[in-house]
């Protein structure tokens, strides 16, 4: 399975209002529930006003479009990283999944995943 290394720094944060998010930014994930509005974005695009903020994330994208009938893809990746004491923040889109790790664990995560048989592109 191919994983695409994302070559930018990411921030995970919470905002008080959806209006705080630049919807014209080139790359971001947002989730809104009855409890919070979360945002994952390029660190340089982080809104000025956040209620909580955690910088220093890097990521991988599972290449290709994942069919909803596929089982265990994210679980397998997260287990490999957990066995090597690397925490993750996972984000899913309609097509695929993204795995974020803290910047200080990024190179270790790449090495571990390649050793486990994944191809990084």
Feature-to-residue mapping (PLM):
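A cross-kingdom feature marking solvent-exposed beta-strand/loop segments within repeated
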Residues: 84-99, 105
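Regulatory modules associated with amino-acid/nitrogen control
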Residues: 1-82, 108-121
């Amino acid at each position: 399975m191919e994983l695409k290394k994302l070559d930018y720094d990411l921030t995970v944060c919470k905002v008080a209002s959806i209006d705080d998010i630049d919807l014209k930014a080139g790359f971001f994930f947002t989730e809104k529930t009855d409890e919070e509005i979360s945002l994952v974005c390029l660190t340089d695009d982080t809104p000025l006003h956040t209620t909580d903020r955690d910088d220093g994330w890097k990521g991988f994208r599972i290449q290709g479009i994942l069919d909803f009938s596929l089982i265990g893809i994210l679980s397998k990746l997260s287990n490999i990283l957990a066995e090597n004491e690397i925490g993750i923040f996972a984000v899913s889109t309609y097509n695929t999944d993204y795995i974020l790790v803290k910047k200080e664990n990024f190179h270790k995560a790449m090495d571990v995943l390649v050793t486990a048989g994944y191809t990084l592109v």
